[in-house]
Curated annotation (Swiss-Prot):
GO terms for biological process: sorocarp development. It holds the Pfam family Coiled. Belongs to the hssA/B family. This is HssA/B-like protein 28. It comes from Dictyostelium discoideum (Social amoeba). It comes from the Eukaryota. The gene is hssl28.
Length: 87
């Protein structure tokens, strides 16, 4: 499973920042956000927050995954599938 990740600024534990998706033009955009807590503890206090975005009319969909290992360092990436931070 390929994970493209980018390190973001350090955040406090249990703080999730919301993402806003806006549409330019007349294309219809449907936004659905799912908060998924992975029950698989990959080591210590690791957890992940997953949001799913789909766009009708534009023909694409992607999953954004938020994972934190100890609650202080965070990474945001685009993954195919769900709960792929353990791989």
């Amino acid at each position: 499973m390929t994970i493209l990740s980018a390190i973001t600024s350090i955040t406090r534990p249990n703080k999730i920042s919301k993402s806003v998706v806006s549409s330019n033009g007349g294309a219809s955009l449907s936004l659905s956000s799912n908060s998924v807590a992975c029950a698989t503890a990959c080591g210590g206090s690791s957890y992940s927050y997953s949001s799913s975005y789909s766009s009708s009319g534009l023909g694409y969909s992607y999953n954004s995954s938020y994972s934190s290992s100890v609650g202080y360092s965070s990474s945001v990436g685009v993954v195919i599938g769900s709960c792929g931070h353990c791989s």
